[in-house]
Amino acid sequence: MSAQPDIHAYIAEFDDIPGTRVYTAARARQGYHLNQFAMSLMKAENRERWKADEAAYLADWPMTEAQKDAVLARDYNRLLDLGGNIYFLAKVFSTDGLSFLQAVSTMSGMSTEDYAAMMNAGGRSPDGVRSISANRAAGGATGSEANRAAAGAGNTREDC
């Protein structure tokens, strides 16, 4: 009889794919208050308070400073790393007047037009940085160098 596969080890393998974030139970716990903040923007009165003074509105939420800083910077990639769920974060960019397409294009390092064209043509090319560890082992760029290179392919992870 074979042993049960380790689901945590399996999910951890996805961390090696640039730009891929599996929304796990751990990530959900990490981002609980962040996502609750985002959902609060469903109410008009909360959106008005948010627009009037973002920092003051965030002060009412028990989020980490890193989460608050990322919200204020509208760094959606960082917010995903900090437990944000893109469907909850949609409330933030909708409040800013951005469409899903506009917001997601900011995560790719591409203009909205270039991102839309890429997606309409079938999505990101399979060429480029496909594995963080393989790229490092091959002596490829790491850190911000790989991040910039990956952005052109739709990747923006800090740990490329």
Where are each of the predicted segments found?
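Charged, low-complexity intrinsically disordered segments
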Residues: 2-160
